């Protein structure tokens, strides 16, 4: 199928939606009428408080306000979700787009939109209208690709997490399969994939804490909302309507719901889950009479063959197309080859239900109503920490969990020819690790297993299938248990202090092994004298980060050097890198890593005794999604460290080309603490600022607060906004 045919099909199907059926003049008139029912109030941090007469009106205003702040990020998210990034970025993004197009098909989404519940269609219509009205009233804003948004496009990006399940498909292996003769993945690709799998990388995810009234000073439930994402991945805003909508929090750019946040009665915090809900099936493929079949039990079923076209911007700027013949079995699309078999990928694909669940939970007012929304079972990747003004707290595992035969190890490809490996429906919510109001008075998740969510009152691992968790405990999980068990009189301030507790739990295990290695080294070994000052410092260190701590710098650089020596071997041995570093590296390796760390610090900063804040920096130079960092430009010291070492307040930083300092790009991004008393009270901070425009005073106005962990008051109620309003206006009104 040619691109022209695809565009014609898209236009024909899109014409079925109300916003697309009228003329441009009629569209604009309808959009202006909607804008007249919407008010946007910008507070003194540039945060939008949007009110509409209906929920749809609020959606219109909310996405319009997002576009004002950073249209570039909105378009980038939908280029990714629709598999159209290569149209903007060129051939290098073709494989990313092909991966998405294995699941996302415009014609399918248009059909799903047409069958959606009327209330949801109204929200999607308003979403498209809001973005199109922004473009119509801001001609200086030049989209790279999407010049007109259609309502069905909202179904391509229905879940707010930074990494969808589809991203677990290896681009290298996808390229090896569809870019070369099948079953002949190159040695270079395999080597690249292995190197990427073991390299040091910042953990992604989040921290969520829910504190019951029994553990708080004032008898009100508390909720910590602390996503660890790429900086500036979400917008902070409030959306309200006369239909009962009143949600505040973090909304992923371009989506029309608050992903992590709260309303007047309840709050929700999502953390990336360790549950195994995406599976690979190794298919035995046969060729007969020029056709492909795969074995399934005693059957030989036909492989589904289709064509996918991926447009991309060629070097001359023109639009070119790559055409792929893709294959599927009933398990899913083929994404790679391994050991002489084709591997099919299975994951949740319920875009309508996922969008329903994402929006409806923002209107839940208590645990029961939140759980009712969860019965849609369209959340596959996120745990949830919940709290409400009735004093209830809860932990929910993801709701889309396929029921499987626990004899098989689903962390690896299973035999697709064996019907026993197939998914057998979904688990009931009651069959997953869930907790409500545990006696200890707190719940937490830090992207660790659910079996420490409530200390001794946690779900028991033996009661659940293996696939309910695929990671185990983590340093941040150990740290969270430590701070939450330490008191029973939490206030918003002390919960913030707990969220920024500086203890680095990973080094509590690792530094003693380094000390032992050093102490057992013979006195006549030259390394003993060379590393003596470093060991004196590390042995006396309290294992806490701070901007002035030289020990933090040395420990982090040592940890990174030892990780590089350990990760590949740990992967081969099937153990965690932390365990391998502590227990299986030799004394000589541990000391060599310390010498390397000392040399790096001295070479880059003049002395191994360099304060951590001189190295670890926050910098925002421009509004680009991928920023170029520069040691000669202003930056801010950040005291907290990587979540890799157990820091709850996570700052994922590293060196970049041309820099010696470390610059953060992920980790703490939006942080909020919410108290559910007679009136909800909240404090929050975002990385950098709300605006993506470097000329705006709200581009970096929160940066210092962010680095210091100083949260500001959230203006949730209209009376709180009094005296803090910069501007009130309706969409389309000029500045």
What are these regions (language model features)?
Residues 58-61, 107-122, 355-361, 463-471, ...:
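Second-shell loop/turn segments in exported
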Residues 2-20:
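Gram-negative bacterial Sec-dependent N-terminal signal peptides
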Residues 105, 109, 120-123, 127-130, ...:
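Stable alpha-helical elements in mature extracytoplasmic
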Residues 247-249, 379-487:
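Hydrophobic alpha-helical segments
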Residues 556-635:
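Charged, long alpha-helical assembly modules
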Residues 457-462, 466-527, 616-735:
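Terminal end segments
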Residues 24-234, 242-244, 249-257, 262, ...:
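Substrate-recognition/specificity elements adjacent to catalytic centers across diverse enzyme folds
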Residues 244-255, 261-266, 270-414:
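Glycine- and hydrophobic-rich flexible loops that cap the catalytic core of alpha/beta enzyme folds
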């Amino acid at each position: 199928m040619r691109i022209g045919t695809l565009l014609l099909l898209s236009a024909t199907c899109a014409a079925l939606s109300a916003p697309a059926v009228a003329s441009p003049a009629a569209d604009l008139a309808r959009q202006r009428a909607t804008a007249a029912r919407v008010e946007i109030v910008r507070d003194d941090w540039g945060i939008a408080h949007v009110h509409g007469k209906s929920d749809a009106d609020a959606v219109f205003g909310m996405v319009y306000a997002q576009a004002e702040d950073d249209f570039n990020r909105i378009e980038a998210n939908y280029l990714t979700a629709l598999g159209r990034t290569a149209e903007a970025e060129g051939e290098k993004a073709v494989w990313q787009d092909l991966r998405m197009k294995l699941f996302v098909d415009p014609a399918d989404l248009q059909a799903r939109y047409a069958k959606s519940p009327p209330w949801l269609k109204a929200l999607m219509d308003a979403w498209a209208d809001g973005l199109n009205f922004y473009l119509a009233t801001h001609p200086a804003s030049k989209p790279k690709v999407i010049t007109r948004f259609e309502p069905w496009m909202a179904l391509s990006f229905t879940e707010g997490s930074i990494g969808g399940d589809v991203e677990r498909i290896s681009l290298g292996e996808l390229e090896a399969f569809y870019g070369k003769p099948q079953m002949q993945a190159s040695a270079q690709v395999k080597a690249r994939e292995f190197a990427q799998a073991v390299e040091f990388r910042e953990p992604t995810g989040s921290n969520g804490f829910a504190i019951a009234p029994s553990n708080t000073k004032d008898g009100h439930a508390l909720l910590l909302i602390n996503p660890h994402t790429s900086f500036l991945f979400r917008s902070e805003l409030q959306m309200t309507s006369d239909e009962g909508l009143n949600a505040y929090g973090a909304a992923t750019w371009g989506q029309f719901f608050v992903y992590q946040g709260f309303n007047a009665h309840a709050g929700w915090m999502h953390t990336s889950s360790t549950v195994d809900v995406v599976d690979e099936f190794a298919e035995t493929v046969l060729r007969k009479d020029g056709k492909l079949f795969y074995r399934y039990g005693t059957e030989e079923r036909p492989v589904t063959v289709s064509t996918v076209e991926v447009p991309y911007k060629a070097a001359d700027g023109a639009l070119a197309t790559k055409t792929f013949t893709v294959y599927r079995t009933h398990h899913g699309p083929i994404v790679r080859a391994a050991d002489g078999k084709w591997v099919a990928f299975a994951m949740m694909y319920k875009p309508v239900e996922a969008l329903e669940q994402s929006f409806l939970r923002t209107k839940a007012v208590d645990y029961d109503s939140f759980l009712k929304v969860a019965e849609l079972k369209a959340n596959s990747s996120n745990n949830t920490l919940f709290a409400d003004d009735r004093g209830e707290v809860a932990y929910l595992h993801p709701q889309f969990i396929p029921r499987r035969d626990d004899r098989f190890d689903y962390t690896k490809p299973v035999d697709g020819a064996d019907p026993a490996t197939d998914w057998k429906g979904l688990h009931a919510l009651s069959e997953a690790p869930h907790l409500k109001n545990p006696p200890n008075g707190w719940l937490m998740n830090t992207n660790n297993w659910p079996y420490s969510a409530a200390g001794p009152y946690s779900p028991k691992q033996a009661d659940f299938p293996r696939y309910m968790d695929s990671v185990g405990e983590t340093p941040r999980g150990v740290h969270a248990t430590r701070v939450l068990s330490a008191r029973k009189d939490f206030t918003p301030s002390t919960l913030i202090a707990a969220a920024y507790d500086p203890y680095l739990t990973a080094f509590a295990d690792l530094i003693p092994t380094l000390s032992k290695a050093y102490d057992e080294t013979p006195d006549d070994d030259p390394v003993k004298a060379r590393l003596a000052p470093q060991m004196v410092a590390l042995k006396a260190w309290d294992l806490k980060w701070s901007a002035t701590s030289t020990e933090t710098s040395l420990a982090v650089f040592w940890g990174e050097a030892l990780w590089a020596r350990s990760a590949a071997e740990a992967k081969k041995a099937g153990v965690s890198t932390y365990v391998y570093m502590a227990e299986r590296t030799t004394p000589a390796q541990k000391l060599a890593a310390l010498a390397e760390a000392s040399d790096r610090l001295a070479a880059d900063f003049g002395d191994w005794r360099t304060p951590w804040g001189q190295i670890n920096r926050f910098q925002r130079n421009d509004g680009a999604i991928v920023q170029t960092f520069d040691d000669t430009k202003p930056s801010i010291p950040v005291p907290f460290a990587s979540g890799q070492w157990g820091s709850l307040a996570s700052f994922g930083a590293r060196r970049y080309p041309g820099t010696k300092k470390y610059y953060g790009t992920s980790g703490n991004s939006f942080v909020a603490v919410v108290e559910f008393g007679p009136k909800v009270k909240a404090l929050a901070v975002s990385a950098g600022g709300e605006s993506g425009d470097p000329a705006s005073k709200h581009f970096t106005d929160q940066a210092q607060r962010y680095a210091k962990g100083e949260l500001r008051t959230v203006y949730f109620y209209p009376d709180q906004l009094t005296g803090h309003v910069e501007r009130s206006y309706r969409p389309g009104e000029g500045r």
